[in-house]
Amino acid sequence: MTIHTVTLEVTANVPKKVLFALLSDHAKLGRFFNAQYTLVRSGKPEENGIGAIREVIHGPFTYQEQVIDYKENEHIHYQIIHGAPVNEHGGWIKFTSINATQSQIHYHITFSPKIKGTGWLLKYQIQHFLKQALNNLIQHSEDVWQSTPTVTPYSHTTHEQDAISTKTRAK
């Protein structure tokens, strides 16, 4: 079957460690994705790290994803191991710092459909689902980050992060 790809890049006005913490917390991913997530098996040594399995209920589909590579604040690589209307599904999420208060997520998915001729539809649905989820993630992370006061080491005064517009780009 044909391999299809979905690639999205988003920029957020928060450090990459904030985005990583939110996207690596399997049990709470439902806040951003229109699906229910449950951590079925913990990874090692980190609970959400390599070997972690999460169950996803999305509409009529129930499937499991397993983390196969993980480096804190850098990347997460997972694959679907059971269920879903796709074969050979792999997801790569890379986190990059732009500066101290801005970062980028590069999200790349490859898959092949189980039913021939449905790849274009699945690609559209995955891209829409993922774009909506990343926009929700960025809005949440920026709201939380900007409402959290920080202390400067010299003046000992409190200030909020400056707001910079968020950009979303789909390839």
Please identify what each model-predicted range represents.
Residues 82-132, 139, 148-149:
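Beta-strand/loop substructures that line and gate deep hydrophobic ligand-binding cavities in soluble
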Residues 11, 22, 77-80, 107-109:
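Residue-level detection of beta-strand scaffold positions
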Residues 15, 61, 72-73, 98-102:
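Short strand-connecting beta-turns/loops that link adjacent beta-strands
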Residues 8-10, 63-69, 90-97, 109:
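Hydrophobic/aromatic beta-strand elements that line small-molecule binding cavities or substrate pockets
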Residues 1-3, 47-49, 58, 86-88, ...:
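Short coil/turn motifs at beta-sheet boundaries
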